[in-house]
């Protein structure tokens, strides 16, 4: 992701990467040590993205957005709104009503956070992205103050849609972001 961003030029195509991570806490640039309560056996990795601490693990769909914002005429706030709307639209397709919050970036179902965001912009290009909780173990979130909020309750899609997996959510997520970016049809290739 860093190498791609460092090496790209005005003619480089944008890319969207869909991945799952092994268990890890990532601490953003604004991260404060007091928000990491009991990491235990889960490693803590410093990240150059914005935001505080979050957890990544199996069953969570991470989407890295490697976009040339200058070329797309998008500001940072525009990108945050676009990512939040991507998740809202994806969840609406499977019958889950979700919403962003002005006071805490991300996407929520009721008061529970289901998706976290963290971005970095370098030379007008974005990297990092979002993490959507699909069918993961949420208990590691109890070891941190998610996104710097003590007591933040986290959620996952399978609380409302039992058959959800990253395999059936990833293509929907990709289709929704491409629609909002006004991109042409795409081919989804699972690695």
Curated annotation (Swiss-Prot):
Record carries keyword Acyltransferase: yes
Location of the active site: 147
EC number, as in UniProt: 2.3.1.181
Record keyword Iron present: no
Annotated site, Lowers pKa of active site Cys, chain positions: 113
Single Gene Ontology BP annotation: protein modification process
Residues annotated as domain BPL/LPL catalytic: 10-185
Localisation: Cytoplasm
Gene Ontology MF terms: lipoyl(octanoyl) transferase activity
GO annotations of cellular component type: cytoplasm
Catalytic reactions on record: octanoyl-[ACP] + L-lysyl-[protein] = N(6)-octanoyl-L-lysyl-[protein] + holo-[ACP] + H(+)
InterPro entries: aa-tRNA-synth_II/BPL/LPL (IPR045864), BPL_LPL_catalytic (IPR004143), Octanoyltransferase (IPR000544), Octanoyltransferase_CS (IPR020605)
Record SUPFAM superfamilies: Class II aaRS and biotin synthetases
Residue sites binding substrate per the record: 49-56, 116-118, 129-131
EC supergroup of this enzyme: transferase
Keyword terms, alphabetized: Acyltransferase, Cytoplasm, Transferase
PROSITE patterns the record matches: BPL_LPL_CATALYTIC, LIPB
Pathway entry: Protein modification; protein lipoylation via endogenous pathway; protein N(6)-(lipoyl)lysine from octanoyl-[acyl-carrier-protein]: step 1/2
Note: In the reaction, the free carboxyl group of octanoic acid is attached via an amide linkage to the epsilon-amino group of a specific lysine residue of lipoyl domains of lipoate-dependent enzymes.
Family: Belongs to the LipB family.
Function summary: Catalyzes the transfer of endogenously produced octanoic acid from octanoyl-acyl-carrier-protein onto the lipoyl domains of lipoate-dependent enzymes. Lipoyl-ACP can also act as a substrate although octanoyl-ACP is likely to be the physiological substrate.
This protein's name: Octanoyltransferase
Native source organism of the sequence: Salmonella choleraesuis (strain SC-B67)
